[in-house]
Curated annotation (Swiss-Prot):
<protein>
    <recommendedName>
        <fullName>Phosphoribosylformylglycinamidine cyclo-ligase</fullName>
        <ecNumber>6.3.3.1</ecNumber>
    </recommendedName>
</protein>
<dbReference type="GO" id="GO:0004637">
    <property type="term" value="F:phosphoribosylamine-glycine ligase activity"/>
</dbReference>
<dbReference type="InterPro" id="IPR036676">
    <property type="entry name" value="PurM-like_C_sf"/>
</dbReference>
<dbReference type="GO" id="GO:0046084">
    <property type="term" value="P:adenine biosynthetic process"/>
</dbReference>
<dbReference type="GO" id="GO:0006189">
    <property type="term" value="P:'de novo' IMP biosynthetic process"/>
</dbReference>
<dbReference type="InterPro" id="IPR004733">
    <property type="entry name" value="PurM_cligase"/>
</dbReference>
<dbReference type="InterPro" id="IPR010918">
    <property type="entry name" value="PurM-like_C_dom"/>
</dbReference>
<dbReference type="Pfam" id="PF02769">
    <property type="entry name" value="AIRS_C"/>
</dbReference>
<dbReference type="InterPro" id="IPR036921">
    <property type="entry name" value="PurM-like_N_sf"/>
</dbReference>
<dbReference type="Pfam" id="PF00586">
    <property type="entry name" value="AIRS"/>
</dbReference>
<comment type="similarity">
    <text>Belongs to the AIR synthase family.</text>
</comment>
<keyword id="KW-0436">Ligase</keyword>
<dbReference type="GO" id="GO:0005829">
    <property type="term" value="C:cytosol"/>
</dbReference>
<dbReference type="GO" id="GO:0005524">
    <property type="term" value="F:ATP binding"/>
</dbReference>
<keyword id="KW-0963">Cytoplasm</keyword>
<dbReference type="GO" id="GO:0004641">
    <property type="term" value="F:phosphoribosylformylglycinamidine cyclo-ligase activity"/>
</dbReference>
<keyword id="KW-0658">Purine biosynthesis</keyword>
């Protein structure tokens, strides 16, 4: 018996690398040394940094992959993978430099997986980071044929004196919420249960734009790199940032606040997309689970002083983002109060 008979096609793996080369090369940056195919990727740090600090992040796409593979939405989950990583590291004010991907599959399907990598490359291009390397592992018997899992790794850099860590946030500062692109990549274990329980037709229209349900659910995660870089280039003094992922606003917004401060949120201050109301109704999801599972239309938060709100909102609008003042930072009104208050119970 040979390796191919055992389920691993080495020649197909080499052909797959050739298939994705163009997409990968399109993500290059001037700091890159050499090309793809070596044992490691090489990259210089950008010029002009006095005390560069590296910021690393890793993430996956979760069970959204199950739904995406059922409906052949391979390109979109590639973007999701990049977004879940870069959106985390930019909360420190860092600039993404490079991305690495890991794909594990039961049987190499070059057409499907090349679409995944094209999506990853697209996410990297929009984030101005190079897809410097990756690994595709064919694992017969471990994953079923036609199924794959993804993991991503991002490295970013920030000038040490410009690190944004929330330490300057004080009571009275304002919280700006930036629109999400739908569910992003969180809550899909619940979504899949709701779909199974409701028996909903995946092609039903769920909003005023007449978007089919499956398209609304599988919208790629928004990339906030350009937005944050634009705000920083306009010298908006951002005090803190939060990427709203699993756990929603209650779990993620307090992560950028100093100890001893709370966030007060006004739920009616932004438009919650209709897909979230559909899920809540179809799945009989309790109010607190709804808020603690989904982003509900807010994918990223900025904390700025009151006198910077107007300028920050103007920049968001100029580059095509809907954004709202959704709350404020305050001191706890009673001992032991939750870090985020104001949400419906």
């Amino acid at each position: 018996m040979d390796y191919k008979t055992a389920g691993v096609d080495v020649k197909a793996g080499r052909a797959f690398v050739d298939l994705i080369k163009t997409s990968v090369n399109e993500t290059s940056r001037p700091e890159v040394i050499g090309g793809i195919g070596g044992f490691g990727g090489f990259m210089r740090l950008p010029h002009g940094l006095e005390n560069p600090v590296l910021v690393a992040g890793t993430d996956g796409v979760g069970t959204k992959l199950e739904l995406a593979q059922d409906y052949h939405a391979h390109f979109g989950v590639g973007i999701d993978l990049v977004a879940m990583c870069v959106n985390d590291v930019i909360t420190s004010g860092a600039e993404p430099l490079l991305f690495l991907d890991y794909i594990a599959t039961g049987k190499l399907a070059p057409k499907d997986l090349s679409e995944v990598v094209k999506g990853i490359a697209e996410g990297c291009k929009k984030s101005n980071c190079v897809l410097l390397g990756g690994e595709t592992a064919e694992m017969p018997g471990f994953y079923s044929k036609g199924r794959y899992d993804l993991a991503g790794f991002c490295l970013a850099v920030v000038e040490e004196k410009k690190i944004i860590d929330g330490s300057t946030i004080k009571a009275g500062d304002q919280i700006i919420g930036v629109q999400s692109n739908g569910l992003h990549s969180n809550g899909f274990s619940l979504v899949r249960k709701v779909l199974g329980m409701s028996g909903a037709n995946k092609s039903i229209l769920v909003d005023t734009k007449k978007t089919p349900l499956i398209d609304s659910l599988l919208q790629p995660t928004a990339l906030y790199v350009e937005l944050v870089q634009s705000l920083l280039k306009h010298t908006i003094p951002i005090k803190g940032m939060a990427h709203i992922t699993g756990g929603g606003l209650p779990e993620n917004l307090p992560r950028c606040l100093p100890n001893g401060l709370n966030a007060f949120i006004e739920p009616g201050s932004w438009d919650i997309p209709e897909i979230f109301f559909w899920l809540k109704k179809a799945g009989h999801i309790p109010e607190d689970d709804w808020w603690n599972t989904f982003n509900l239309g807010i994918g990223f938060c900025l904390v700025v002083s009151t006198d910077q709100v107007e300028a920050a909102l103007e920049i968001c609008t100029e580059i095509g983002w809907d954004a709202w003042t959704i709350g404020r930072v305050q001191e706890p009104t009673v001992p032991g109060q939750q870090r985020l208050i104001g949400l419906p119970e």
